[in-house]
Amino acid sequence: MCETASRTLPPGITPISGDEARRLIHHTSGPELEALLDRAEAVRRAVHGDEVALCGITNAKSGRCPEDCGFCSQSARFEGADAPVYPMIGAGEIVEQAHKAERAGAREFSIVASGTRLAREQELATVEEALRRLRAETAVEPCASLGLMREPELRRLKDAGLMHYHHNLETARSHFENVCTTHTFDEQLETIRAAKGLGLKLCSGGILGMGETPEQRVEFAEEVRDLGVDCVPVNFLNPRAGTPMAHLKAITPEECLAAVAVFRLMMPAAHIFVMGGREVNLGDRQDLIFRAGANGTMVGNYLTSAGRAPDLTVGMVERQGLTLRPPDTGKAWAFDGHAPSDADWNRKAAEPRPRPLPVVR
């Protein structure tokens, strides 16, 4: 899904400075916001054209995470959280979900697992098998989001067919300890740099609306920019019951759009994806994410919450006069221009999931 963030920019397109970003991040109303969105859209069109990439995911292992990330319902530390709890699903189910996402228009498909890192050799072997099958049986570009990882593990996954590695910074360094205390900001950087050293495409962003200031949103964008990542997923907090951040008030749609636009102007070459929380925080203004400079979004469900039906997401893209970007794997794409409706997408919801593990508090 993601090309190099160091691509040559068209004449006249240069990243804005941090100082300018700190000024523009406050342009959240009236003519100032309109001008900011117009500027971001012009940069998006000049650098990325009118194609939008969709990403699908599978929650391959859920719950019982030992970390204390304050936004996450999968933490075992939060008694009131209600995320599903189950062990790593099989490679066959991962591939089945990838086929489903591909038919819905996904260009990239990510295998996501809860926890600090993969805890067992068998889990790593399952992901390896799934990656080999994804490359053989689908056209999607395989991605994984498996927590903190070392170079030898990442190399095994790359050899199995991994194209992209996703690991969010989550927030600015100055705000990180307010979000998580069980691992450090620098540990996250180590994982990202290990993936980059292997030549994997990098996907790293975070969540806005976790109590950070507008200036810290810019600080966060500067840190992501300096890593030279290919894709920047921008999420907005969707407060989950039982988590320490359940009480936080959603940031306004205007704040969301201004942040996306500033990120686009700071990182013209990066692929910027508006992901989780867009339905809750933007509501009927979701269509404006592309005017704000985004050139990608999620299709289907999130990790522990429902997303829009795929046909609504594809329709949102098409209403803006944009088209879906196919994978770069050189294989025939299963998307035929008709994304499934909500009824089709959730047809298998009643089928049994893997046997849940008991919740250990």
From Swiss-Prot:
Catalyses:
(4R,5S)-dethiobiotin + (sulfur carrier)-SH + 2 reduced [2Fe-2S]-[ferredoxin] + 2 S-adenosyl-L-methionine = (sulfur carrier)-H + biotin + 2 5'-deoxyadenosine + 2 L-methionine + 2 oxidized [2Fe-2S]-[ferredoxin]
Q: Which domain of life is it from?
A: Bacteria
Q: Where is the composition biased (Basic and acidic residues)?
A: 339-354
Note describing how the cofactor binds:
Binds 1 [4Fe-4S] cluster. The cluster is coordinated with 3 cysteines and an exchangeable S-adenosyl-L-methionine.
- MF-aspect GO terms: 2 iron, 2 sulfur cluster binding; 4 iron, 4 sulfur cluster binding; biotin synthase activity; iron ion binding
Task: Give the cofactors, semicolon-separated.
Answer: [4Fe-4S] cluster; [2Fe-2S] cluster
Q: Which family does it belong to?
A: Belongs to the radical SAM superfamily. Biotin synthase family.
What is the recorded name of this protein?
Biotin synthase
